[in-house]
Structures are given as structure tokens and as C-alpha cells.
Amino acid sequence: MQDTLSSPILAGQTAVVTGGASGIGKSIVQRFLEAGANCLAADLNEEALAALKEEFAAYGDKLDIARVDVSDRDAVEGMVDRAVDMYGQMDIIVNNAGIMDNLLPIAEMDDDVWERLMKVNLNSVMYGTRKAVRYFLDRGEGGVIINTASLSGLCAGRGGCAYTASKFAVVGLTKNVAFMYADTGIRCNAICPGNTQTNIGVGMRQPSERGMAKATTGYAGATRSGTPEEISAAALFLASDQAGFINGETLTIDGGWSAY
């Protein structure tokens, strides 16, 4: 049986990954490169992008980097155009970029937090997915969309109000797209990581006491934190032809936390 984690199962394909300079996104970029794909890593952090390019210099032009504000529709659409111009095609898009909300319950949340979370966590996914679907339809060969949702897109008590709402919406968007375009060869799935060792929580300098207490119920001692490599392994599988009949799925990767 072919080893999906070390063989070039994406050879000849091109992938775009947002939030691709760190954490889960960086690990997905590495997995895809190792699997033979060309990859455009998009991120807001220019220093992290430069470090990524240097770290993976052995891949040469197979890795392209682009500073992209995913809350900007034109920037997201331009990102896809750049990948197509660079490599002649795009076969896979991973809408991975996201931010958190300090676990704020609704009574502690202001409008700015809500609007920022929706722009980055939801609008960006819609922009990337819509652009990809239009491109795939024009090309007529199908394609793969992977959206990073979260355990908070399935379990309402694992995050703040805005974060949870944004991730539930990502799950709904994913399933709708999968069903609407299933007859075109387009597959759209979501990965739903639980607690993972990444830098997404760096911005949570003052998490809500109520939110933290509620969100971590049942977690202490239940399971360890996941690693970006464990999440990216699932993304690679979903991107490959071995997942050819998997569409509209939400793949939970949480070590059993959601079983509580």
C-alpha cells in the first residue's frame, strides 16, 4: 500500500495555503511540498514568510510566498491568480488563516471583535472558496477545497462567541459547497482541530475568565494537545486522490476531546 505521508501523491499539482507561514498552515505547506506539489504560501506576516522561504529553500521555485490580508477580497482573489500565473494551474486551496477572540462570551464582546473575527475567519474562507470554485468550473477538471474550521465549529462551548459562530459558519459553507458542486468533480471538506500547539493563541493575552472556565470543561487530563504535523497529515489525505469519495466532511482531529 502506498505511504500517503512520504510518497509524491500530489506530484504535478499546485496548492494555495493561507496562514501558510506558521503553525498548521506551515506544516501543511511542508507536507504538500514533500508530496510533490507546487505551493503558494500566503500569510500576513512578511518576516515569517521570508523565514519559510529560507527554511524550505531546497524546494526552489516549487514554493512561492505572498503577503496576503485574507480579509481583503481582492487580495485573496489575486492570490489565486498569482498561483495560476506562476504554475499554470491551481488544484488545491486550503483556507487555513484564522484568529481567536480571547474566549469572550457574548456579554463581554464588542462589535469590533465580532466584525474582525467574521472578516478573517469567515469572509476569507468564502472569498477563497468562491474564487476556487469559479476557477475549477472554468477549467472543467474539478479541484479540492479544504477549510480549516475547528472543534469550535462543531461544539458550541469550546471557544468564544465570535470564534464559535465563525467556525460553525465555515462548516455550513463547506457542506453547502460540497453538495452544490458534487457533480462537477469539486470536493470541499473541513478539518476541525482541537487544542493544537500553534501560535494562534498568542493574541489571547487576557482571555475571559468565564470563557476559559467554560471552554476547558472536560479537557484537563482528558487528552494532550495535538501537533501541527498531526493536523497536516489529515489535510494531505483530504487533498489526495485517496480521499476521492470524501466530500462535505468535517474531520475532527482532537484526541477525543469532543467525545466528552
Regions found by a protein language model. Give the residues of each.
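Short C-terminal tail/terminal secondary-structure segment
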Residues: Q2-S7, M100-L103, C155, L236, ...
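Canonical Rossmann dinucleotide-binding motif of NAD(H)/NADP(H)-dependent dehydrogenases/reductases
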Residues: S7-L40
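Substrate-binding pocket helix/loop in short-chain dehydrogenase/reductase
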Residues: L104-I106, D110-E115, T216
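Active-site helix of classical SDR
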Residues: T129, S166, T174
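Residue(s) in the substrate-gating loop at a strand-loop-helix junction
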Residues: S150
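Short, small/polar-rich loop/turn modules that mediate ligand/substrate recognition or access, typified
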Residues: A182, R187, I246-G248
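C-terminal helical subdomain
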Residues: A190, E209-I246, I253-G255
